[in-house]
A protein has these predicted regions:
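Bacterial N-terminal signal peptides
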Residues: 19-31
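A mature extracytoplasmic/lumenal domain signature
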Residues: 77-79, 87-89, 99, 107-111, ...
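Short, hydrophobic-biased amphipathic alpha-helical segments
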Residues: 181-193
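Beta-strand/loop substructures that line and gate deep hydrophobic ligand-binding cavities in soluble
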Residues: 137-184
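N-terminal secretory signal peptides that target proteins for export/translocation
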Residues: 1-16
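Hydrophobic ligand-binding cavity/cleft-lining segments
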Residues: 37-100, 188
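Glycine-rich portal/gate segments that line the openings of hydrophobic small-molecule binding cavities
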Residues: 53-54, 65, 94-142, 191-203
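One face of beta-strands
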Residues: 45, 58-62, 107, 120-122, ...
Length: 203
């Protein structure tokens, strides 16, 4: 006879599923090892992160500034095949097609909670223009809709960065859990990116 899952186990699984939205965003996003320590050590101001939900669709907007030049920021954000190195929950990120200003990037990410593991699959059509990277999922396997953009604009001696994501998960998650985790994990993702921006600029 198969034992039924306890309320704690079911809640844990919902929390695990909720973490996936940010874990896979080139974006976006991310339960990253060491991110909490980086946030403590990083004196940079906390990013402005807004999460909204409407009829099962979640919209995330994040804004932050970094001292690096836009060219450095965009070089990191568009280094698709190296994403697993600085965003470890993204297990694979492979460029399947490449044309001027357009790419197709296939990504897989894994989120774990205790003995439970969930894999997310994306096939992103990416369009690059001056200062902006837009992406949309074309496979619909893990999300019924998933699209967003990064923008990097020169500001003073650094760069103002904006991240936007609109996603509708293909799994059930309580709204209050997902909104809270999206906001927290977006902040962790940004801290990880800040570290990578600084490392690239120092080369």
């Amino acid at each position: 006879m198969r034992a039924s899952s306890s309320p704690q186990t079911r809640d844990g699984r919902r929390r695990c599923a909720a973490r996936l939205l940010v874990a896979v965003a080139v974006c976006v996003s991310v339960a990253l090892p060491g991110a909490r320590a980086a946030a403590i050590a990083d004196p940079a101001p906390s990013p402005e992160v807004l999460v909204r939900e409407e009829r099962g669709t979640y919209r995330v907007t994040a804004r932050f500034e970094v001292p690096e030049a836009p060219a450095v920021v965009l070089a990191v954000l568009s280094d698709y095949e190296q994403i697993p190195r600085f965003m470890p929950d993204v297990r694979t990120s492979v460029v399947r097609e490449r044309a001027p200003g357009r790419l197709v990037v296939e990504q897989e990410a894994v989120s774990k909670f205790m003995m439970f593991s969930k894999q997310v699959h994306l096939v992103l059509e990416v369009n690059e223009s001056e200062g902006t990277i837009r992406f949309v999922d074309r496979c619909g396997k893990s999300f019924t809709s998933y699209q967003g953009a990064w923008s990097a604009v020169s500001k003073g001696n650094g760069t103002a960065v904006t991240y936007e994501l609109t996603a509708r998960p293909a799994f059930d998650v309580p709204e209050f859990i997902l909104k809270r985790l999206l906001k927290r994990d977006s902040g962790q993702m940004i801290n990880r990116l800040r570290s990578e921006f600084a490392a690239r600029a120092a080369r």
